[in-house]
Amino acid sequence: MTESFGNVYEDTERARAYAQLDYPGTYYLAFRDLPMLVHKHVRGIRALDFGCGTGRSTRFLRNLGFQVIGVDVSQAMLAQARDRDPQGDYRWIGEGGLAGLEAGAFDLILAAFTFDNVPDERKIAALPELRRLLARGGRLLVVVSSAAIYLHEWASFSTRDFPENRTARDGDFVRIVMLDVPDRRPVIDVLCSDTHYRELFGAVGLAVIDAFRPLASGAESVSWVSETTISPWTIYILG
């Protein structure tokens, strides 16, 4: 990678844009099947939303009946989360990371899009900590952008202006524009293929129990583009 990595989400304008999102368009597919997967794989009600952003996934888990804590590295995102959900438990994780949380404290940890824009070294640092926080029999659900999302057009995203995405390899920067928000600056993510994710999980002792790739049925009231034939997301269930 030739560009410096920064926390693009520590940006007030982008945080405001994210706060307006619920589950429009392509994002709907990332969350549609989570209740089914949680019911199938998770026992217990203690949850951690790792990389909670503006809190939409935290609220989602609470609506499923979980006692949930949302954590993030972005103060700007957390400010939006607290504004929208004053009763929620949102915590900033700074230099100490997750060290302040008790080992084995969570039956479910959700990381929704948290790993999309971080390099390998940060994934490798975070994954053992998340494993440490899982209760016996607990599950880590990781929702990530599939490699295909950076190659096609979607109801909620565009990549047509970034042909260089096609030659990107694991660890390279890839760009994508969100169409559901006024802020049309490209989001810069770090490509991580399914094979590479599985290597990273295995390296820290996390087993892939299931992997789910959601598709649209075509019956939804959305003008899908690629979503009925190509999955934009992968949901890993780890333990």
Predicted regions, residues:
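Conserved class I S-adenosyl-L-methionine
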Residues: 1-42, 56, 60
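Nucleotide donor/acceptor-binding cores
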Residues: 44-46
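Class I SAM-dependent methyltransferase SAM/SAH-binding core
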Residues: 48, 54-98
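A short acidic, Gly/Pro-enriched loop at the edge of an enzyme's catalytic core
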Residues: 99-109
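A short SAM/SAH-binding and catalytic strip from SAM-dependent methyltransferases
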Residues: 108-122
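A short glycine-rich, Lys/Arg-flanked "PGG" loop and its adjoining helix->strand segment in the class I
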Residues: 124-136
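SAM-dependent methyltransferase
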Residues: 141-199
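Conserved Class I S-adenosyl-L-methionine
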Residues: 186, 190-239
